[in-house]
């Protein structure tokens, strides 16, 4: 017997995405924690594996993290080698492991065998399909990747900063073509994308110093510092060398606070952005903390775990500025009626409700499903903007 699901069609979602989701309903079950998605995009069969934490419901509006493999690898490589599934349970996030065409991504590199597929379009269609199926949050979209997957994450942030809240690149920079296309005037605050870049100085595949059609790791980071309007001088901290036998050490370069990640016209109401660079001196073309054999080439740093650091940067304490950079929290834990009273009637763009990521939300007087419990920013009737802890 066939079971059909009712859909509420939205104008802002292309019809093709709905057709993808309707097709997927017939090829996988809804109970599995890891699901293989297969659909056509741009005339090509595209696949991805998706992990959903146990017990999650679409109403939870979880964030979505794309984990992109390196050249010659696959989504399965990343799933089996990086430990993101366990972290997804801790941080309550959906993880997607897409597959590139011919095990590569269209990074505009000109490298022999590189993909020419519309990977930006595919990955956004995948994100929209997952959002419609599992209820992930539209603006809580992240991408990270190894090597070519890092290149692709940079391209996503350059071309679609309106969709991604943050990216992370491990051993991946930008091609000179992609880098040139990414340059331009500073973006408005609501289009800033936070960056975490991790790179070994002894990387023999994607050189730390650049070359072979790629820019250097430091050039990538510095361009993002300018793009996000960060301080020119970073705070530099040496990570403890807890594992002395790995032939490498780590320095963290943190550029913060950058331009506020909030809507224009709110007087910097959004939290400050940031750029973080982890320089692994002596590190190879590897994923720090990884123990899987044949994953990369060269020294593997063991002083930190790249996957854990990425998830913390995306969704944990690393996602926020320091306490001194944030407005004081109020002790008040208001009811919904106290928070929403009057806001739904206001047409003033400087008033409203913003989440912790600086995204402005329309206020519905009765529909509270769009708002998570936790910290929200409110401004009403010319009052000073302030953070409020909304109830469960």
What residue spans do the PLM features occupy?
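Active-site-adjacent alpha-helix of alpha/beta-hydrolase-fold enzymes
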Residues: 201-275, 289-304
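Residue-level detector of functionally pivotal "anchor" positions at catalytic/ligand-binding pockets or at interdomain
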Residues: 231, 318-361
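Gly/Ser-rich "nucleophile elbow"/oxyanion-hole loop immediately N-terminal to the catalytic nucleophile
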Residues: 55-59, 107-148, 158
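Active-site machinery of serine-nucleophile hydrolases
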Residues: 73-129, 277
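Active-site glycine-rich loops that stabilize anionic/oxyanionic intermediates
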Residues: 70-73, 283
């Amino acid at each position: 017997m066939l079971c059909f699901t009712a859909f509420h069609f939205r104008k802002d979602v292309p019809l093709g995405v709905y057709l993808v989701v309707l097709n997927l309903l017939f090829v996988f079950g809804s109970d599995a924690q890891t699901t293989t998605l297969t659909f056509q995009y741009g005339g090509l069969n595209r696949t991805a594996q998706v992990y959903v934490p146990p017990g999650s419901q679409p109403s939870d509006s979880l964030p979505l993290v794309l984990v992109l493999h390196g050249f010659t690898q696959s989504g399965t490589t990343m799933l089996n080698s990086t430990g993101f599934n366990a972290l997804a349970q801790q941080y309550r996030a959906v993880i997607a492991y897409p597959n590139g065409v011919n095990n590569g991504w269209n990074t505009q590199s000109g490298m022999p065998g590189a993909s020419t597929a519309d990977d930006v379009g595919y990955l956004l269609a995948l994100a929209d399909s997952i959002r419609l199926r599992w209820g992930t949050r539209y603006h809580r979209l992240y991408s990270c990747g190894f090597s070519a997957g890092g290149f692709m994450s940079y391209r996503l942030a350059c071309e679609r900063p309106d969709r991604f809240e943050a990216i992370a690149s491990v051993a991946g920079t930008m091609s000179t073509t992609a880098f040139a296309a990414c340059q331009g005037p500073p973006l408005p605050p609501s289009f800033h994308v936070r960056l975490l870049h991790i790179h070994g100085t002894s990387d023999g595949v994607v050189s730390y110093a650049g070359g072979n059609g790629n820019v250097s790791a430091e050039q990538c980071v510095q361009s993002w510092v300018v793009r996000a309007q960060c301080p020119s001088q970073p705070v530099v901290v040496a990570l403890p060398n807890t594992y002395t036998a790995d032939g490498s050490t780590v320095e963290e370069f943190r550029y913060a606070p950058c331009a506020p990640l909030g809507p224009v016209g709110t007087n910097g109401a959004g939290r400050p952005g940031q750029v973080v660079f982890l320089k692994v001196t002596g590190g190879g073309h590897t994923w720090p903390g990884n123990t899987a054999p044949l994953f990369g080439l060269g020294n593997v740093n063991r002083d930190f775990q790249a996957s854990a650091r990425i998830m913390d940067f995306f969704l944990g304490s690393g996602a926020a500025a320091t306490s001194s950079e944030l407005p004081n929290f109020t002790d008040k834990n208001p009811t919904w009626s106290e928070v929403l009273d009057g806001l739904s009637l206001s047409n003033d763009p400087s008033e409203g409700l913003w989440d912790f990521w600086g995204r402005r939300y329309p206020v519905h007087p009765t529909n509270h499903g769009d708002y998570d419990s936790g910290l929200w920013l409110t401004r009403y009737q010319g009052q000073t903007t302030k953070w409020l802890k909304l109830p469960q």
